[in-house]
Curated annotation (Swiss-Prot):
Residues 147-217 are annotated as: Disordered. InterPro entries: bHLH_dom, bHLH_ZIP_TF, HLH_DNA-bd_sf. The lineage of its organism: Eukaryota, Viridiplantae, Streptophyta, Embryophyta, Tracheophyta. Keywords: DNA-binding, Growth regulation, Nucleus, Transcription, Transcription regulation. Plants over-expressing CIB5 show increased hypocotyl and cotyledon lengths and increased flower size. This is Transcription factor bHLH76. The keyword Protein biosynthesis does not apply. It is found in: Nucleus.
Length: 390
């Protein structure tokens, strides 16, 4: 026996089996008013006659007239879930949504059956057991395709195009997606190239990059301006101070001989210091020389005046000496002596020298007169002479 004969025998067994042997596991597969509403229109429609198609197919191939009676309805369908899933997967209603809608419209199948069959479909990745029912579902699918092809030939060849669309739908979707992705990538690359080539975009980018940097530079410039103002004020004060110093240095240059020829402040200061040191040495040398020539320079004027007063009261002085050194009372009356000590201190240098020289010359004259006369004057004469005013 061939495969088709085995399939026909198995088909008969399935048809002749009672419904009670298959307990309804799924409540959707049991007899219901919804199924009863379209069972007669689906299976007993004139346009959807499986009996005639099966007879013609079997007669053409094996010359065996095996009638396929489809008198059973949806309620007589076995409640095996595996069989239902396999039949739904390999049925011609699973070829695609477009093909199913077209077949339903051409065969007059109501929309409820399409919904029912879509709900009963299983995912493509589920594993199915190989068995005789798979062969039956394959044959049913082939017959449905043949029917669709015959209908398309009778109508003008539209069915063949629909079948091709169903077969190439998956390939078309994948190719379209690839094309779209490729187009998107190309468009993005073109945009990038255009942006890179266009000078305006580059200018905008540079401007956008320069804006934050410009803000930072502005703040930096403000800080530099403030610091510059502070430095300017400080520099002005420094300039004024340096000008004053330069003026004083010029004054010192005028005082110090030979300092005009020197350039540079440091060298000029050295010259001034050397000149001051030389002056100090000269003053010390002169003071030492004066002390050697006149050892009694540091005498007190008051003690000297007291000594003069005591000497004027003594009888040993001659007439000339009394006139040279008058008493203190006479000096005070004539106004020669002033009680202001400050004026005396100013003239102390000249007075000291004059008095010392006069004292020494008078002493020398006194000694010479004593040697000539050899006699001392009387006290009365001296007093009389002192009373006489010139």
């Amino acid at each position: 026996m061939s495969d088709k004969d085995e399939f026909a025998a198995k088909k008969k067994d399935l048809v002749n089996t009672p419904v009670d042997l298959y307990p309804p596991e799924n409540p959707m597969l049991g007899p219901s008013p919804m199924m009863d509403s379209f069972r007669e229109t689906l299976w007993h429609d004139g346009g959807f006659n499986v009996h005639t198609d099966a007879d013609t197919s079997f007669r053409g191939n094996n010359n065996i007239d095996i009638p396929l009676e489809m008198g059973w309805n949806m309620a007589q369908f076995p409640a095996d879930s595996g069989f239902i899933e396999r039949a739904a997967k390999f049925s011609f209603f699973g070829c695609g949504e477009m093909m199913m809608n077209q077949q339903q419209s051409s065969l007059g199948v109501p929309d409820s059956t399409g919904l029912f069959l879509q709900d009963t479909q299983i995912p493509s990745g589920s594993k199915l057991d190989n068995g005789p029912l798979t062969d039956a579902s394959k044959l049913v699918k082939e017959r449905s395709i043949n029917n669709v092809s015959e209908d398309s030939q009778s109508s003008g060849g539209n069915g063949h195009d629909d079948a091709k669309c169903g077969q190439t739908s998956s390939k078309g979707f994948s190719s379209k997606k690839r094309k779209r992705i490729g187009k998107d990538c190309e468009e993005e690359e073109d945009k990038k190239q255009k942006d890179e080539q266009s000078p305006t975009s580059n200018a905008n980018k540079t401007n956008s990059e320069k804006q934050p940097s410009d803000s930072l530079k502005d703040g930096y410039i403000h800080m530099r301006a403030r610091r510059g103002q502070a430095t300017n004020s400080h520099s002005l004060a420094e300039r004024v101070r340096r000008e004053k110093i330069s003026e004083r240095m010029k004054f010192l240059q005028d005082l110090v001989p030979g300092c005009d020829k020197v350039t540079g402040k440091a060298v000029m200061l050295d010259e001034i210091i050397n000149y001051v040191q030389s002056l100090q040495c000269q003053i010390e040398f002169l003071s030492m020389k004066l002390s050697a020539v006149n050892p009694v320079l540091d005498f007190n004027l008051e003690s000297l005046l007291a000594k003069d007063a005591l000497q004027s009261s003594a009888p040993t002085f001659p007439h000339n000496m009394s006139m040279l050194y008058p008493p203190v009372s006479y000096l005070s009356q004539t106004g020669f002596m002033q009680p202001n000590i400050s004026s005396m201190s100013l003239l102390s240098g000249g007075l000291k020298r004059q008095e010392t020289h006069g004292y020494e010359s008078d002493h020398h004259n006194l000694v010479h007169m004593n040697h000539e006369t050899g006699t001392a004057p009387d006290h009365e004469d001296t007093t009389a002479d002192m009373k006489v005013e010139p």
